[in-house]
Regions:
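Catalytic Walker B motif of ABC-type/P-loop ATPase nucleotide-binding domains
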Residues: 173-177
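Helix-to-loop junction immediately C-terminal to a conserved catalytic motif
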Residues: 56
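The feature captures the beta-strand-to-loop junction immediately N-terminal to the Walker
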Residues: 41-43
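ABC ATPase C-loop
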Residues: 165-166
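Conserved catalytic motifs of ABC-family nucleotide-binding domains
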Residues: 169
Length: 268
């Protein structure tokens, strides 16, 4: 975690999101500092994706304060929030099916421009080309740039969505279940790519149910349950937290993750 002199990049205070009488996000506080990698876990329906929807403006908060670098964003629209520096991926592998990887990533880069209307700026000038090329390299897609989206396997579709988000050059990247539906080898491939982003200094909030992925990448872990934050801290503290074990992990999973963390520590 950042030292006390560092100002948060993102602050969330007393954030609520109601759907009718249901509090999908319930009095949620979070500080995100530059360079943070925050992993959010929890059972299905805990409010994880809704929280990202609130931050990114897709589903505005019912109440509460959210600020990026001190600028209030709780009532801003998604495009305005993206222009300020927050980009995200989604659980569904969305893309323009008849367009290439490169063209899809260009759409992402264009959306990130702080300009009135983004379609008029979809020109492949030098700035745009550099953004797209860098994003494709970071996601290991540079050799597949001409492939059409409809022909891509699930892994490459997930990486394409990540590349599109990175092409906006975000200050904060929100990643929603990047390895859902992937096999263990593919999970490792995505983990390596995210580790590269961390080395680049990208600030990340990621949601994931695959706990080995979440624990190995996150500097700080948050667990949600019924819209509330029931844990925030490091990986070791998570495995020793009785409430987290009871409502989410279970004894067997906690023991396996503990063993994994011990082996990782032994092997450096």
């Amino acid at each position: 975690m950042a030292n006390e002199e560092t100002q948060p990049l993102l602050t969330c205070r007393n954030v609520f999101k109601y759907f009718g009488g249901l509090a999908a996000v319930n009095d949620f506080d979070l500080d995100v500092f530059p360079g943070d990698v925050i992993g959010i876990g929890g059972p299905n329906g805990a409010g994880k994706t809704t929280f990202l929807d609130v931050i990114s403006g897709i589903s505005p908060a019912t109440s509460g304060d959210i600020a990026l670098n001190g600028t209030p964003i709780a009532v801003k629209k998604p495009d305005a929030i993206c222009h300020l520096g927050i980009s995200r991926t989604f659980q569904l592998n969305a893309g323009f099916e008849t367009m290439s990887i490169e063209e899809n990533t260009l759409v992402g880069a264009s959306f990130g421009l702080g300009d009135k209307g983004w379609f008029p700026r979809m020109t492949y000038n030098r700035q745009m080309r550099e953004r797209v090329e860098k994003a494709l390299v970071l996601c290991n897609l540079q050799d597949k740039a001409d492939m059409v989206v409809r022909d891509l396997p699930v892994l490459d579709r997930k990486l394409l969505m990540l590349a599109g988000a990175l092409a906006t050059e975000p200050k904060l990247l929100l990643v929603d279940e990047p390895v859902g539906g992937l096999n263990p080898h593919e999970v490792d491939d995505v983990m390596e790519i995210v580790q590269g982003l961390i080395k680049e200094g990208v600030t990340i909030i990621l949601i994931e149910h695959v706990m080995r992925f979440l624990l190995q990448l996150s500097k700080r872990v948050v667990i949600m349950h019924h819209g509330e934050k029931i844990y925030e801290g490091d990986s070791q503290g998570l495995l020793n937290d009785r409430k987290v074990v009871e409502v989410y992990l279970g004894e067997g999973t906690a023991d396996r993750l503990q063993h994994m963390m011990e082996e990782r520590a032994k092997n450096g």
